Amino acid sequence: MNTILGSDTVKRGMAQMQKGGVIMDVVNAEQARIAEAAGAVAVMALERVPSDIRAAGGVARMANPKIVKEVMNAVSIPVMAKARIGHITEARVLEAMGVDYIDESEVLTPADDEFHLLKCEFTVPFVCGCRDLGEALRRIGEGASMLRTKGEPGTGNIVEAVRHIRKVNAQIRKVVAMNHDELMTEAKNLSAPFELLLQIKALGKLPVVNFAAGGVATPADAALMMELGADGVFVGSGIFKSEHPEKFAKAIVQATTHYQDYDLIARLSEELGEPMKGIEISRLQQHERMQERGW
């Protein structure tokens, strides 16, 4: 089989086009159309949003292709879909279906507890989660074209996403301040490719976009993550588990775009009704913490 590989430049360029926007989880065509009308730059097609996956337990797998196709046929914006960590065949199936992006996602039950996908061998671009700079650079080294914080999906609690974006950015500042002769040791400490540390040193930032994800539940949450340096926002359960999904979707898009307009965010938040019910992170058992999946 002859495989045509997409270049890093093209793949990363597609992600750059989403910068500053909101990507919303949807489970059917109706939700996808709501997301598109609200101004989402892309949608993530799943069978269940993260809060439902968390509640159901068991093994969470790639969405039924019928659902993914339904969403793809319903909207004109890019459609993403999730594959299990290390599940080569799920990723190949999604690629064959023509999705615009694949999320190698810790929200689903990992298929491989030792190896992530070698994403550079695919034509379709990938997004992956990270909690720190080491994880970020390992995923980029495998071929990820876009990153997102892991946060703690399905909780409606922003604290872990805040922790992750702050840690990545602090570690980037540390690398930028280093002398070149210190970078190899830092690469060893981070278990990350040396060449990527050189890129960060030169660019002053990651070579790919890094979105916020995992716990965004309100317009203020979305604005906070942008304030902390995120390039955009993924919203999983926060929209369609709220009292008024259409209003929430539009408000989160506006808050992401105008994240320093605090008067606007206040007005947007007035008539939204109840957000999704949240979970205190400390109440989660170790095996319930999705962010611990992958390495």
From Swiss-Prot:
Concerning CDD domains, the annotation shows: pdxS (cd04727)
Binding-site positions, D-ribose 5-phosphate: D25, G154, G215, G236, S237
Gene Ontology BP term (one): amino acid metabolic process
Residues involved in D-glyceraldehyde 3-phosphate binding: R166
- Look up the domain of life of the source: Bacteria
Which reaction equation describes what this protein catalyses? Answer: aldehydo-D-ribose 5-phosphate + D-glyceraldehyde 3-phosphate + L-glutamine = pyridoxal 5'-phosphate + L-glutamate + phosphate + 3 H2O + H(+)
Catalytic residues identified in the record: K82
Biological pathway: Cofactor biosynthesis; pyridoxal 5'-phosphate biosynthesis
The UniProt entry's sequence similarity note says: Belongs to the PdxS/SNZ family.
From the Swiss-Prot or TrEMBL record, give the protein name. Pyridoxal 5'-phosphate synthase subunit PdxS
Species of provenance: Pasteurella multocida (strain Pm70)
Q: Which gene encodes it?
A: pdxS
